[in-house]
A protein has these predicted regions:
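Cleavable N-terminal export/targeting peptides
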Residues: 1-27
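C-terminal outer-membrane beta-barrel translocator/porin domains of Gram-negative envelope proteins
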Residues: 23-37, 44, 52, 93, ...
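Long, low-hydrophobicity, solvent-exposed regions enriched in small/turn-prone and acidic residues
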Residues: 39, 66-69, 86
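Core alpha-helical transmembrane segments of integral membrane proteins
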Residues: 59-65, 72-81
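Post-signal peptide N-terminal segment of secreted/secretory-pathway proteins
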Residues: 80-97
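A short alpha/beta connector and helix-capping loop motif
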Residues: 327-344
Length: 380
């Protein structure tokens, strides 16, 4: 995306923003709420943080979100539609969700045609990664396009335990890098993006189960959480994979704590490239670029000592990860060995904004230092 395109984007999008949260229409237009009596909301671009994003595939992607809550034979439901357009690749993203929700359960039927990231939990399509991609030319996500339907049932409890079961039918296809604009590129030179991940094209029918458990509410005592994820699919290829992630937060003295994290993953069958385990970047292996390791199985550990001050939290940390060689992932991962890193970090605003300086121990030279700035625990 060129600088001229950026000017066009800003000129066209800024007038859309309406602080009052309303959408102007003519006198003869009647809203869904007026006709049906059902509550409804419509939001554009700047009115929600998930309606404007930036990445190396789409460039800027402004969107709109509309929701209506009609009555039905099974009680009130919410119908939510989202649409956005990548201004660099000119491809639309569409999603329609039908949700029935109670105090503990949520059932959602979805239809979608959209860009997605290989690691949904890392939030690469959210605000934090969009900022670093636009400003610094560092996009940690890897993307592909999926089209299909899904049915999801989720349950949560006051004990901080949750269960999610999802059944899906999806068609996957690769995406090319289309954007070439960053703010840093205006100052220095045109950025060279990381190549996007390859994709095994085809239909995949399957299901997934996520079980999460958290314990410990008092920060003066140990706190922990565990996540178990299972997924299986058939169609273009047949596969199954399982992942386990656990973390423990232990206070040691006043304003100081130790945080430990470990994860393992394995798979059987013909695992698609987009369903492989990939490590690298702030969320899995600091000090290394995303997708430095990848394959059909992995193991990783992380240790951190944090001291709280009035201005934020200062930490010393070390990460380690391993992924064995697998010929199916040639060209998608940069390395196949055990990697380690050490570093220091600063987090401010109750751990919302993080700054990390990490040194990968693969090479003992100053150029092995990597700086990262990112958002964490974003409540959207």
């Amino acid at each position: 995306m060129s600088a001229a395109t950026l000017k066009f984007v800003l000129c066209c999008m800024l007038p859309i923003y309406s602080p009052g949260g309303t959408v102007p229409f003519g006198q003869n237009w009647y809203s869904i709420e007026e006709v049906s009596g059902a509550p409804r909301t419509i939001r554009w671009v700047f009115q929600r943080p998930d309606l404007l994003r930036y990445n190396r595939v789409e460039g800027f992607s402004p969107g709109v979100r509309a929701q209506i809550r009609p009555q039905s034979p099974v009680g009130p439901i919410s119908v939510t539609g989202m649409a956005s357009l990548g201004l660099a690749n000119l491809k639309p993203n569409l999603r329609l969700d039908f949700t029935r929700e109670t105090l503990q359960d949520r059932i959602t039927f979805s239809g979608f045609h959209e860009l997605t990231a290989i690691d949904e939990r890392a939030g690469h399509l959210k605000l934090g990664n969009s900022i670093t991609a636009l400003v610094a030319g560092r996009d940690d996500g890897d993307y592909y396009r999926q089209s299909g339907v899904s049915l999801e049932w989720a349950r949560s409890s006051i004990e901080q335990n949750s269960l999610r079961i999802r059944v899906f039918g999806e068609y996957h296809r690769p995406e090319k890098i289309e954007s070439d604009f960053t703010i840093w590129g205006l100052i220095n030179e045109k950025p060279e993006w990381r190549p996007n991940i390859g994709v095994d094209i085809g239909w995949f029918l399957g299901s997934s189960i996520d079980i999460a458990s958290k314990w410990g509410l008092d920060p003066l005592f140990p706190q922990g959480q565990m996540l178990v994820s299972l997924e299986g699919g058939a169609g273009t290829s047949e596969y199954a994979r399982v992942g386990l992630l656990g973390s423990l937060d232990i206070p040691i003295v006043r304003d100081m704590r130790i945080s430990l994290e470990a994860g393992v993953g394995a798979s059987i069958g013909d695992l698609p490239i987009q369903r492989g385990w990939y490590l690298g970047g702030p969320s899995t292996l600091r000090g290394f670029p995303p997708r430095v390791l990848g394959g059909a199985k992995f193991a990783r550990v992380r240790g951190e000592v944090t001291r709280s001050f009035f201005f934020g939290d200062v930490s010393l940390f070390s990460d380690g990860a391993w992924a064995p060689y697998d010929h199916r992932f040639d060209g998608e991962a940069d390395d196949h060995r055990t990697l380690f890193s050490v570093g220091s970090g600063l987090s401010v605003l109750d751990q919302l904004i993080h700054f990390d300086a990490s040194w990968n121990l693969r090479y003992f030279r100053p150029s092995s230092v990597r700086l990262d700035a990112y958002l964490d625990f974003v409540p959207f």
